[in-house]
């Protein structure tokens, strides 16, 4: 059951200009993760899925934007983002992850 939980930790890679620059320069991958996970869960999931060594993990909560149409006001969901810094010599191919 623990392995099944680790497979659900990572939702998707966060693809943006900033994350692609971080991957090229500093060997950092940026991931969207489930809101309730801890750094240890993220560490185990990334190590298991990609077979890499991790140097450091930074996690932050991204608050949802307020969106409105005419008189209705709504909010997008909050989500968690993880910056995973890999040790030297390890790389991750994010193109295979998106499939």
From Swiss-Prot:
Gene Ontology molecular function: rRNA binding; structural constituent of ribosome
Signal peptide: none
Alphabetical keyword list: Ribonucleoprotein, Ribosomal protein, RNA-binding, rRNA-binding
Keyword Transcription regulation applies: no
Gene Ontology CC annotations of this record: ribonucleoprotein complex; ribosome
Any matching Pfam family: Ribosomal_L23
Domain of life: Bacteria
Transmembrane segments: none
GO terms of biological process kind: translation
Function per UniProt: One of the early assembly proteins it binds 23S rRNA. One of the proteins that surrounds the polypeptide exit tunnel on the outside of the ribosome. Forms the main docking site for trigger factor binding to the ribosome.
Subunit structure: Part of the 50S ribosomal subunit. Contacts protein L29, and trigger factor when it is bound to the ribosome.
HAMAP family linked: Ribosomal_uL23_B
Protein family: Belongs to the universal ribosomal protein uL23 family.
Name of this chain's protein: Large ribosomal subunit protein uL23
Source species taxonomy: Bacteria, Pseudomonadati, Pseudomonadota, Gammaproteobacteria, Enterobacterales
Gene: rplW
